[in-house]
Amino acid sequence: MTMESGTRPARRRVVVTGVGALTPLANGAEASWQRALAGESGISWIERWDPGDFPVRIAGEVKTTPELPWIDAKAARNVARYARFGLAAAAEAIEAAGLDQADFDHTRAGGMLGTGAGGMESIVEMTRTFDARGYGRVSPFFMTTFPHNMGSYHIAQAFQLHGPNATISTACATGAQAIGDAFDVIRRGQADIMVAGWAEHAVFPLFVASFIG
């Protein structure tokens, strides 16, 4: 980008054209929004694991495990839960925006995904395997499961987003920052389309214990 001395580059208008969500309230942005408007709560008893003697046994837990028809079945087996949430939400947003992959320049489309915990649960699970059965039982695919950047990678790979791509990790602000950074990328003219948001899976024993310990 170039600009003459004393002038500023024109700022492009940026608009949101599609929204997706997978929440404790519902699978889908519209259903989640309607239930929120109706005063329903996404907080419920933890079901995916037994909290035992934990003093807190409720959480905002996503009950479902999204299927991943957008990626290879073998690859899907090694996608961390948080990344599954991100893929499902991204797919809904792309569909809601009416984006046809044949109709846009893939080098001008990118993604920004925020996550705080990333695939931490995958680390916990593989550590158990390592402790119980030794190094020989550690999956060679482990290194493609837990990293924070894998969620953003899977979205870019599934929907052929070959433009700017990044992973943001700034705790509870990460989703807002990812959307803000994507906004800036478009406004600066570095991309025409950005898929941006936040994906998190934090309702597992170690993470919950860290908040109540």
Spans of features found by a protein language model:
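ACP-dependent fatty acid/polyketide chain-elongation machinery
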Residues: T2-A75, A97
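Acyl-thioester C-C bond-transforming condensing/cleaving domain
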Residues: T2-R11, N27, L37-I43, E95-T107, ...
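Basic side chains
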Residues: R13, K74-R77, R81, R108, ...
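Structured loops at beta-to-helix junctions and adjacent beta-edge loops in soluble globular domains
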Residues: V19, G114-G116
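A glycine- and small-residue-enriched flexible loop/hinge segment at structural boundaries
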Residues: R48-L99, E121, H148-H162
